[in-house]
Amino acid sequence: MSTPEQEVEYRQHRFSPPPGATEIFLVRHGESAPAKGDNPFELVDGQADPDLAPEGRDHAERVGRRLADERISALYVTTLRRTPQTAAPLAAKLGLTPEVEPDLREIHLGEWENGLFRRYTYEGHPIVEQLWREQRWDVIPGAETMESFGGRIRAAIGRLAAANPDRRIAVFTHGGVIGEVFAQASAAKNRFAFLGADNGSISHLVVSGENWMVRRFNDTSHLQSPFG
């Protein structure tokens, strides 16, 4: 007597990176020191280079604990010291020396470097309103053009992906950079749609050739921050 053939089950697909793809955890640096008019930041190639604030060092420790078991093969930082300072706890846990990727440094804010962007944002400067209305950093006098910024970010991500096929890497970078990466990945019409990643947050991108896939944005669960 024949038995009924077992019914085939078709489960929902679970994502896995394509062969040769690179998983990139983009970590925004921890909170940096506050800007003070009578104590300007040091500059590196014309860009403000503040240390981490005490809160930022706590962010760095929490990031290190969160990512310590994520099979990360390489770490990258920028030329601005708040990124290697944020990477330091994870680097110590993994026994890895971070490599410097200069092109993932923050957008250059021209005449508004050295804390002036923070001040003018707080004061409600009319150019800040124009910046958000037009979705362009280069309305700020002397700022890097959007074309230059977007081009160097895309080139840098492409280089890191090409150097790390089938690997996971962590990139310690800046809020403007993360916003630009995810705007490009999603082809967002609003260029600032992903601006505002929190200090110490982790975002996750998968790069397979020219295809950039968004996996998560602004994960702060390790920071124990409520929604807000």
Describe each region flagged by the PLM.
Residues 61-68, 150, 154-162, 182:
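Generic structural signal for well-ordered alpha-helical scaffold segments
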Residues 1-23, 66, 99, 107-119, ...:
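Acidic, low-complexity terminal tails and accessory targeting/binding regions
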Residues 77-78, 151, 172-173:
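Short beta-strand scaffold positions
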Residues 82, 177-180:
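Glycine-rich phosphate-binding loops at beta-strand->alpha-helix junctions
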Residues 30, 175:
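Active-site metal-binding loops of divalent metal-dependent hydrolases
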Residues 2-25, 31-100:
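Active-site-proximal alpha-helix that buttresses catalytic centers in soluble enzyme cores
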Residues 89, 180-184:
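Active-site signature of alpha/beta-hydrolase-fold catalytic machinery across serine-
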Residues 50-51, 94-154, 215-218, 227-228:
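Phosphate-handling substructures
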